[in-house]
Amino acid sequence: MPYDKKAVHFGGGNIGRGFVAEFLHNSGYEVVFVDVMDSIIEALQKQSSYTVTEIGDDGEREFTIDHYRALNSKHEMDKVVQEIASADVVTCAVGPNILKFVAEPVAKAIDARTLDYPIAVIACENAINATTTWRGFIEGKLSEDSKSNLDKKARFANSAIDRIVPVQDKDAGLNVKIEKFYEWCVEQKPFENGGKKPDVKGIHYVDDLEPYIERKLFTVNTSHATAAYYGHQAKKQYIHEVLQDKKLHDIVRDAVKETAHLIVSKHGVSVQEQNDYVDSIIKRISNPVLKDNVERVGRAPLRKLSRKERFVGPAAQLAERGEKVDALLGAIEQAYLFQNVEGDEESAELAKILKENSAEEVVTKVNGLDKSHPLFEKILPIVKKVQGGS
């Protein structure tokens, strides 16, 4: 089947296959996967299709994803560049720390691009303004000619994505189980004045992305991670088990009550609307059908404890406003206790940092706060307590 639209997607993982590629495929795009994992690319090259199963309260729905191709960027970089140079859209779901490694092929493709409209560049990461970050890495590798007329060659749009992908069955192969709920918001201003807005069913284009990013990150990710870190200490296996425990359920609620206060006061969202949103999120992450593993949700604690992330991000803004942050501080303490968890490098690195640095150095290094910030003095005793093992 010939396609008149093409999207290149970096990252053949569950979010890439089960969310981004599903939407692109269902919107009539031929999808070209790019990854460095030999096993994923070989499987995609061998199999002509895979299944995405959406899990909801009302049961399951299956979708077949086909008519895709796959390239290994370790061995086929020239082909990757050619594909991007002739694509309508390039997306990624590789993890915020990997963005710098997927910049060069995009830069080379922009340099080589001869089409009379710009490619749309959209990062689909759990991070604020990830496309802007990716753009910085890409621009650092562009020719001077491309830099001088970049608007004609590429448009960069930040996005906010929200969809829970639970731990997959061991024998799932390429098939992905994913929750039915989704949100994919993309800023539309970058596509004005000569840009070509991707026609993707399910994307919600918005003028100002920040309220959507912060609402999602400081509600979904904050509640999810709070449940995971408290659940890990309570020896729970799944997130829904954490939330079935009334004491832990109330603790998670308290954390997102604090972030809700920020969302309402900063972005002008009504109290009722934010409360309804919080209720819907707690219901989502409480779904036992997802079998959402506590250790999976808790992994990468260093990133999750960083300055603009789900705990310190909202807590810092609230502290600057003189508002209450007690529940968020509790979650931060639990995150600091997520150390030396099997299969998670960051949890081992966190333990090392706590062992080798003073409490002041830890707060600066891990949380990105200097001593003058009002949150610094609130986190400092937590770190001292964790270091002391009390």
Curated annotation (Swiss-Prot):
- Highest classification ranks of the organism: Eukaryota, Fungi, Dikarya, Ascomycota, Pezizomycotina
Which domain of life does the UniProt lineage start with? Eukaryota
Report one GO cellular component: cytosol
Where does the chain bind NAD(+)? 7-18
Quaternary structure note: Monomer.
Q: Which InterPro entries match?
A: 6-PGluconate_DH-like_C_sf, 6PGD_dom2, Mannitol_1_phos_5_DH, Mannitol_DH, Mannitol_DH_C, Mannitol_DH_N, NAD(P)-bd_dom_sf
Q: Gene3D superfamilies annotated for this entry?
A: N-(1-d-carboxylethyl)-l-norvaline Dehydrogenase, domain 2, NAD(P)-binding Rossmann-like Domain
| Molecular-function annotations in GO | mannitol-1-phosphate 5-dehydrogenase activity
Name its species: Phaeosphaeria nodorum (strain SN15 / ATCC MYA-4574 / FGSC 10173)
Show the catalytic activity: D-mannitol 1-phosphate + NAD(+) = beta-D-fructose 6-phosphate + NADH + H(+)
Q: Name the active site residues.
A: 216
Q: Which NCBIfam families does the record associate with it?
A: PRK02318.2-5 (NF002652)
Function recorded in the entry = Catalyzes the NAD(H)-dependent interconversion of D-fructose 6-phosphate and D-mannitol 1-phosphate in the mannitol metabolic pathway. Required for the process of sporulation on senescing leaf material.
* Keyword terms of this UniProt record: NAD, Oxidoreductase
* Similarity section: Belongs to the mannitol dehydrogenase family.
User: A single GO BP annotation from the record?
Assistant: mannitol catabolic process
Pfam short name (any one): Mannitol_dh_C
Q: Please report the name of this protein according to its UniProt entry.
A: Mannitol-1-phosphate 5-dehydrogenase
Q: What is its EC number?
A: 1.1.1.17
